[in-house]
Amino acid sequence: MEKRLQEAQLYKEKGNQCYREGKYRDAVSGYHRALLQLRGLDPSLPSPIPNLGPQGPALTPEQENLLHTTQTDCYNNLAACLLQMEPVNYERVKEYSQKVLERQPDNAKALYRAGVAFFHLQDYDQARHYLMAAVNRKPKDANVRRYLQRTQLELSSYHRKEKQLYLGMFG
């Protein structure tokens, strides 16, 4: 168990190094490998097949904390990588960001990335929700403010079109 936690840390570090070098595909591979090392170790997740195979010793609180921190960091970093790759898979960015937010609801980077994903998936209400939360945590972040402004413009455009539609229907 300790070995798998250490291996996951090494893969995560390789992913971080690749990210710094702009090798996003390799970074994604490193983060995925780290998560694979951790699969099945998380006691808070139900096992797909209970009581199958040998039951390992329970994690210590420190190991469980390291497990959750590593998982959260990997998901957050995966979302960051995917935003740098073409074409961007916004569904995955959304999914990974939400996994981070399950454990760290105040994570400003994950809130921002979720907002960006929802914006590009044209779910502007959800985008606004996440971007407002991000701007509350990082009020000076220009990227967050820019996406929030773009989201507000899309929402007001949508509401104008909706109003015109209803006026046309009901005169």
Swiss-Prot record:
Pfam families: TPR_19. TPR repeats lie at residues 8-41, 72-107, 108-141. Keywords: Repeat, TPR repeat. It comes from Bos taurus. SMART domains: TPR (SM00028). PROSITE patterns: TPR, TPR_REGION. It comes from the Eukaryota. SUPFAM superfamilies: TPR-like. Belongs to the TTC9 family. The keyword Repeat applies. PANTHER family: ARYL HYDROCARBON RECEPTOR INTERACTING PROTEIN RELATED, TETRATRICOPEPTIDE REPEAT PROTEIN 9C. This is Tetratricopeptide repeat protein 9C.
